[in-house]
Amino acid sequence: MKLGPTGERDELIVKEIIRGNFPEFMRRLAPITVAQKGNTLIYNVMPDYLCIGNDQDYVRVPVSGPSAQRIADAFGMLLPTPRMSDQIYEAAKVRLAPKPLSGMANLNIGGKNYTNQQFMASKMSDTDSFNYHNQVIQEQLQGHQPGELVAGHKKDIVLSNDLQPGRLAIHGLHLKGGTPLQPGGISKHEANYKDYSHGVRLVDNNATLNGQNVQMSAILKDPKYAYLVNTDGVLKQVAYKYDGNDKPKTNVPESAVATNTPQTGRGQFLQRLNDYLSKINIG
């Protein structure tokens, strides 16, 4: 399979995440409680968007829809729906104001200056832009502890009944009050597209409904309960497609998330990533 340069970057990121190179605080999931029409569902999510590194030194890493799905499958987890994205924002202890780079007049990324138009035209998907936006977020998070449930700072890669084959669905960058700048899960982008503003929030497949253990993948397919986490009922497609996932894994043991694989710092990973990408001429 020919991946192309940003696909090669995705491959490296997926391998790093699956081997356990992500912060310890990301392994402590945050509960989301939904109580409607006499039913109470409690599901659990990673406290922040997927990142690589350790608790002191990490970088959030946007990837494509299929790559996000590969990571979710490896950990026995799911991607959220737009309603779940809203619920996570509502439950978040830390709600950040969106700071899209595309709204900034002048940017210095990777040691070079860019106007807004130049950035929009050529830098949205660059590794340097991922790191720059990560630094913007870290400045917003000063005074907060890693592991607190945080939301508002990225667009979620989501599952939606509006999702068309080969396309990407995104939802998020919530404003104060909970209204998303990017609503509805509909995207003009192909499934393999990714840029600095996207994030991957993983949802544990294990949940409780009215005190009973359930699987979120089953809830999303249940006509009686899907409304709890999806605005338009039963979710027709509970996974992005990628080579080899005709039967997506949703039952991987919880220990898959609690791996003891040593983490490397953000700086070390970015250096290795940039060294790798320089060989294929992409920043």
Positions of the model-derived regions?
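Cell-wall glycan-active module
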Residues: I32, K37, A256, Q268, ...
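Short acidic-hydrophobic catalytic motif
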Residues: M1-Q56, R60, H171-G177, A191-A207, ...
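Acidic, proline-/serine-/threonine-rich low-complexity intrinsically disordered repeat tracts
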Residues: E254-Q263
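Long, low-complexity, intrinsically disordered segments
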Residues: P262-G283
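Solvent-exposed loop/turn segments at secondary-structure junctions
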Residues: L50-C51, S85-Q87, Q164, A207-L209
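Conserved hydrophobic ligand-interaction patch in extracellular adhesion modules
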Residues: G65-G143, L202
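C-terminal, surface-exposed recognition/capping segments
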Residues: G110-P253
